[in-house]
């Protein structure tokens, strides 16, 4: 009786030469990492909130700590949910959570509401980072997976200087009341573009 040979997707992916498809996956993930800078912008918007009298030492510490707590939780559950739903679905889900919390947070009426939104942002961001790296490395061949991961991390780390430059440009142009709100809306809009690209071009991981 003839045996049916099961496909070995991982081995086939590893045998693929570097090609345009790998570059496309790199571009989508790198852009997604670059623009999800809700964490990077935290200190910048705190400066504006302090000028408005929204925050003191206690609320500043809470604002920062609650974001980190959310990221811890997101990192913990993000991979688990991604294992059950798939990398692509998890990518889009966590982007949606992250974007929605940034938009809602941008229209916060007070500091307590904003802090609550920051927790949700942290959850979405923590889960998103886990899923992006997990999905990306599953596409890349084993022979140079570390190289591809270094490249995508390099692009993602530019989010910190980029959002700082944007904040510098905004400060003389708009009031503090709108400055911090716009600084949350910009990454939300850019992340929406990243989500649309993922929806259109990001396939499910064959390894999953």
Where are these regions (language model features)?
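Transmembrane-helix signature of 12-pass secondary carriers
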Residues: 1-208
């Amino acid at each position: 009786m003839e045996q049916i040979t099961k496909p070995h997707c991982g081995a086939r992916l590893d045998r693929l030469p570097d090609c345009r498809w790998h570059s496309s996956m790199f571009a989508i993930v790198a852009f997604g990492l670059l623009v999800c800078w809700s964490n990077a912008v935290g200190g910048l918007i705190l400066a504006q909130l302090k000028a408005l009298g929204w925050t003191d030492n206690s609320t500043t510490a809470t604002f920062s700590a609650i974001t980190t707590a959310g990221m811890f939780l997101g990192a913990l559950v993000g991979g688990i949910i991604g294992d059950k739903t798939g990398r692509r679905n998890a990518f889009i889900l966590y982007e949606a959570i992250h974007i929605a919390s940034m938009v809602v947070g941008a229209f916060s009426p007070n500091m307590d509401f904003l802090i609550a939104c920051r927790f949700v942002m942290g959850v979405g961001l923590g889960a998103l980072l886990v899923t992006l790296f997990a999905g990306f490395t599953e596409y890349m061949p084993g022979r140079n997976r570390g190289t591809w991961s270094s490249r995508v991390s390099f692009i993602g780390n530019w989010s910190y200087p980029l959002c700082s430059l944007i904040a510098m440009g905004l400060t003389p142009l708009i009031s503090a009341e709108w400055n911090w709100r716009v600084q949350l809306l910009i990454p939300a809009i850019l992340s929406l573009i990243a989500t649309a690209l993922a929806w259109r071009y990001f396939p499910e991981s064959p390894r999953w």
